[in-house]
A protein has these predicted regions:
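Structured, non-membrane catalytic/scaffold regions adjacent to prosthetic-group chemistry
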Residues: 2-201
Length: 201
């Protein structure tokens, strides 16, 4: 009885691993806090640019969430700390017809995230992971974490959040990966979502 009531924790097609594997499209860009800027742009009333001290002054949160990469590994219970995405949405007054957030990163990576997933209470811009300052290869100084989607949407080395009413596909989305990427629906690829095409993301 108890067993049948257990909530399934691992999304379909995934396997547990102990540590997240570092996945990067290129070399890890250096994190220089003195010239760090976070830009919030697009369809907003008040576009802003924040330096590192302004980022640090924002309200903070922490979450513990599983992390699912589309290449089929999942890591249990990573603790992320940082700024809730909702704070940033309020700060710039995002227009009501915004549907997507295009995230741009210092390594040239980008990803587009549906606004409902981006705005969830467990989504954040993290500067700490499992109790320590984010390691360079995990996205320092600041990475997006959207735990309800595959990990390719959790962009590292974030520089800009552009709020859009019309979708603009990011790096992996231009290469056939799913617009949304919900691991529970196995939204891996746009065509043939559960396909066996070799996963790069
Ligand atoms: N800027 C940037 N962010 C990125 C990537 C990348 O190549 N560049 N790779 C993505 C992919 S495919 C995954 S699985 C996760 C991996 O996070 P990790 O390297 O911290 O384990 O980062 C995502 N964010
Ligand atoms: Mo990934």
């Amino acid at each position: 009885m108890l067993n049948t009531m257990r909530i399934k924790r691992l999304p379909p097609g995934q396997s547990w691993v102990e540590e997240p594997m570092v996945y990067d499209i290129g070399p890890v860009p250096p994190a220089r806090l003195e010239d760090y800027r976070l830009r919030l742009s697009g369809e907003v009333t008040k576009p802003i640019e924040l330096d590192w001290s302004e980022v640090q002054a924002l309200p903070r949160t922490h979450v513990r969430r599983d992390f699912h990469c589309v290449t089929t590994w999942s890591v249990r219970g990573i603790v992320w700390e940082g700024i809730p995405t909702r704070i940033l949405i309020d700060r710039v007054s995002v227009a009501p017809d915004v549907r997507w957030v295009l995230v741009r990163c210092r390594d040239g990576y980008s990803t587009d995230v549906p606004i409902d997933a981006f705005a969830r209470r467990d989504a954040l811009l993290a500067d700490r992971m499992n109790g320590s300052i984010l390691a360079p290869e995990h996205g320092a100084p600041l990475r997006l974490v959207v735990p309800c989607l595959y990990a390719w949407k959790s962009a590292k080395y974030v520089e800009e959040l552009e709020f859009l009413s019309e979708r603009r596909p990011g790096f992996w989305e231009q290469r056939g990966y799913h617009d949304r990427g919900d691991p529970w629906r196995e939204e891996r690829f746009r065509a043939n979502p559960r396909g066996t095409k070799e996963a790069g993301a």
